[in-house]
Amino acid sequence: VTRLAGQASGAMTAPARVLVAGTGLIGTSVALALRERGTEVWLSDADEATARLAADLGAGTVVPDLRDAKGIADVAVLAVPPAAVAATLAHAQDSAVADWYTDVASVKELPVAQARDLGCDLSCYVPGHPLAGRERHGPAAARADLFLGRTWALCPLPETAPDAVAAVTALALACGADPVRADPATHDRWVALVSHAPHVVAAAMAARLAPPEVPPGALALAGQGLRDVTRIAAGDSDLWTQILSANAGPVAEVLAAVAGDLAAAARALANASDVTELLDRGRAGVARIPGKHGGQPRSFTVVQVVIADRSGELARLFDAAGAAGVNIEDVRIEHSPGLPVGVAELSVRPDQAGALLDAMEAGGWRVRR
């Protein structure tokens, strides 16, 4: 992977005019981010009501028909599902709506192959994938800050023009992302490991919670660990079916390896054997996940603060931390079932933990370190 931010940040300004074709979560978030930068944004969607909702949210102006939009944009962002990328690219190029084109699909080899088959002009096309998202979908879930500090993969082809890469890189930077470069095949193998297979694993675990598998009352004992493991399983099933089907081979390889580890752990537990080796490998893997701003993982001290479940309590806590000069690096809230309180887990640098504890106790909170 080659990071592109340093190469392009001063080389080209953000595109002045952008067409976003597809106004779901990602497309509308791109539009909102660009609008904050003063970019003129045009919106298109097969469902005109969805496009109009995005427009009502301030994402741009609706274009009812791409056939009437010749030359409307410098860059067209194709924010459609993987299976629709090639056809949308062909339609947009036939209508000559932009100089350069990119997409946001989370798989790259299949759309590229289909675009070749359709005879698309690949010299002005930069396959792309912003690695950001939410469990929710649709324009109402969009956020202008969705891409801040997030990796945005660009996968230019041998025939892609350098000016196209520069324009799309500038667009990613304008959205606040950190653009990196990878070839399509490598991209698909890597996202199978870090994105696609984890979604299947989360879905498999979450499926165990549906009747009749889950015993009555068991979910009353659910804690933050279960929520962490299953959170992404709430994603759009239809979209994820497309994603997984488009990257089936690499995802299947990762799942087979995970299944092997789980089967070995099950055999070990059935025979009262030790599973420490797997758990240790898991800890080592977590330690390799990039930390804040994509840098090396850092070790933080977690301070637990009991907070009342009422309006303004969390803001009061943050204000107290700020007044003490403490930067909260991360926060997680665990609610107590049936009780009007929760526990805020505040991650801070070890050298600031003492100051935070003192500030919390002075503010009347119960704390635990």
Report residues per predicted region.
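Rossmann-like NAD(P)(H) cofactor-binding subdomain of soluble oxidoreductases
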Residues: 88-140
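A conserved regulatory-domain signal marking ACT and ACT-like small-molecule sensing domains
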Residues: 285-369
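Internal alpha-helical scaffold of NAD(P)-dependent oxidoreductase catalytic cores
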Residues: 146-232
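NAD(P)+-binding Rossmann beta1-loop-alpha1 motif at the extreme N-terminus of oxidoreductases
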Residues: 2-65
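Interdomain hinge/lid region at the active-site interface
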Residues: 214-283, 302
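Rossmann-like NAD(P)-binding element
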Residues: 66-102
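Residues in the short beta-alpha loop(s) of Rossmann-like NAD(P)-binding domains
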Residues: 46-47, 105, 334
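Residues at the starts of beta-strands that form the adenosine-phosphate
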Residues: 17, 40, 124, 151, ...
